Design a protein with these regions (language model features):
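Cofactor-/ligand-binding subdomain signature composed of acidic, glycine-rich
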Residues: 1-25
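Thiamine diphosphate
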Residues: 141-199
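Residue-identity detector for threonine
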Residues: 2, 42, 125-128, 158-160, ...
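Membrane-interacting alpha-helical segments
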Residues: 6, 85-86, 156
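Cofactor-binding active-site loop characterized by glycine-rich and histidine/acidic residues
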Residues: 14, 21-141, 165
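Generic structural hydrophobic/aromatic packing signal, biased to beta-strands
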Residues: 13, 49-51, 70, 147, ...
Length: 199
């Protein structure tokens, strides 16, 4: 998909959400389309993708038909989109996919398969203990996995750097075999689309 198509998809979901037609949380992307498209240039059909509750772009770029993604979102499953036939999983639990992604990478390594795991996590999740353990374990065992830290500076409604009282995040600027980082600004709040009140 193109940058314009990704943006149009999210804008459509935002409009439907603000009309009150989606009775569940949504977490929208904006401003990181070029970075996301760049990451997916290296992701192959046989590779696995794990993400958090914000995963619309990943699903679309992994090849899931946009009609199917939209259908799942309208059914209230935006924060837990899973399409095993396309090898993509997401979870609404903070850090929930990290140990699963590491386990998948270990399975690939032990079976000698020609595939790799790509795990997306936000800037706040990247500061948690499970993230540090998952990344260190993967490095130590040279697992076929790559972590992508997406920094939108949001820890729900508080700036991540303020929450942790640190001007620079642990993986800020990282770019190596196991982890990459990018920062972007979004026009959407942490959850929802900025009009309808959501709890």
């Amino acid at each position: 998909m193109t940058k314009e198509e990704l943006i149009a998809f999210e804008e459509d979901i935002a409009a439907v959400f603000n009309e009150g037609k989606i009775r569940a949380p949504v977490h929208l992307y904006f401003g990181n389309e070029e970075e996301m498209i760049g990451v997916f240039r290296t992701i192959r059909p046989q590779d696995w993708v794990f993400c958090s509750w914000r995963s619309h772009y990943q699903c679309l770029l992994k090849g899931v038909p946009k009609e199917l993604v939209r259908e799942e979102i309208l059914a209230g499953r935006s924060i837990s989109l899973c399409f095993p036939e396309y090898r993509i999983y997401s979870s609404a639990i903070v850090g929930g996919v990290l140990p699963i992604a590491v386990g998948a990478a270990m399975s690939i390594q032990r079976r000698g398969e020609d595939s790799k795991v790509y795990c997306f996590l936000g800037d706040m999740t990247a500061e948690t203990g499970i993230a540090h353990e998952a990344i260190k374990y993967s490095r130590n065992h040279r697992l076929p996995i790559h972590f992508i830290v997406e920094d939108n500076a949001k820890s729900v409604c508080t700036d991540t750097r303020e929450v942790w009282n640190q001007p620079r995040l642990s993986f800020e600027g990282a770019d190596d075999e196991y982890i990459s980082y990018y920062r972007y600004e979004t026009k959407y709040p942490h959850a929802g689309a900025g009009v309808r009140v959501q709890f």
